[in-house]
Amino acid sequence: MTYVLFLLSVSLVMGFVGFSSKPSPIYGGLVLIVSGVVGCTIILNYGGGYMGLMVFLIYLGGMMVVFGYTTAMAIEEYPEAWGSGVEVLVSVLVGLAMEVGLVLWVKEYDGVVVVVNFNSVGSWMIYEGEGPGLIREDPIGAGALYDYGRWLVVVTGWTLFVGVYIVIEIARGN
C-alpha cells in the first residue's frame, strides 16, 4: 500500500509539472482533471471515502465545465503539446528530472523528517473504522454544513453565480 501511495504521489506531482509547463489549454485541462482524479484516489486510500467522492464530483465536475468552455473559446488548429516546442519539452524534462532526483533522495535516506507536527487535530484527521459505536465525521460535517451553515451555502452559490456571469461577460467581449 505504501508503494501505491508513493506512485500516486509521484503521478500527482508529475501532473502538476505537466500543467505548469504551459501546454495548450486542451492538454492543460486534461492534466488538471487527471491530477484531480489522482488526488481523490489518494484521499480514498487514506480512508476519506465521502470527502474523496465529494471532491471528485464537485471539483472535477466544475473543472470539466470550465475547461470545456475555455477549450471552445481558445481552440487552435495545431495545439501546442509537450513535445511540440523545445521550451515546453525542456520544462517537462527538467520537472521530471527533479521529481526523479527527489524520489531517489528520499529512498536513499529511507524516509523524510517530519517538520510539522499534528498534535491537536484529532477531529480533523481522516480515519477508517468499522464498529457499532463509531460515527464517521465526514458525512456528518456535510449535514452540519447544510443545517447550521445554510447562509454559507447561499453565499457560496451566489458567489459562484456571479463568477460565472463575470467570466461570460469577459469572454463575450462587450
Swiss-Prot record:
It catalyses: a ubiquinone + NADH + 5 H(+)(in) = a ubiquinol + NAD(+) + 4 H(+)(out). It is a multi-pass membrane protein. GO terms for molecular function: NADH dehydrogenase (ubiquinone) activity. Keywords: Electron transport, Membrane, Mitochondrion, Mitochondrion inner membrane, NAD, Respiratory chain, Translocase, Transmembrane, Transmembrane helix, Transport, Ubiquinone. Its main location: mitochondrion. InterPro entries: ComplexI_Subunit6, NADH_UbQ/plastoQ_OxRdtase_su6. The chain crosses the membrane at residues 1-21, 24-44, 47-67, 86-106, 111-131, 151-171. Its EC number is 7.1.1.2. One of its GO terms (biological process) is mitochondrial electron transport, NADH to ubiquinone. It is found in: Mitochondrion inner membrane. One of its GO terms (cellular component) is mitochondrial inner membrane. It is an enzyme of class 7 (translocase). Core subunit of the mitochondrial membrane respiratory chain NADH dehydrogenase (Complex I) which catalyzes electron transfer from NADH through the respiratory chain, using ubiquinone as an electron acceptor. Essential for the catalytic activity and assembly of complex I. Core subunit of respiratory chain NADH dehydrogenase (Complex I) which is composed of 45 different subunits. This is NADH-ubiquinone oxidoreductase chain 6. It comes from Pan paniscus.
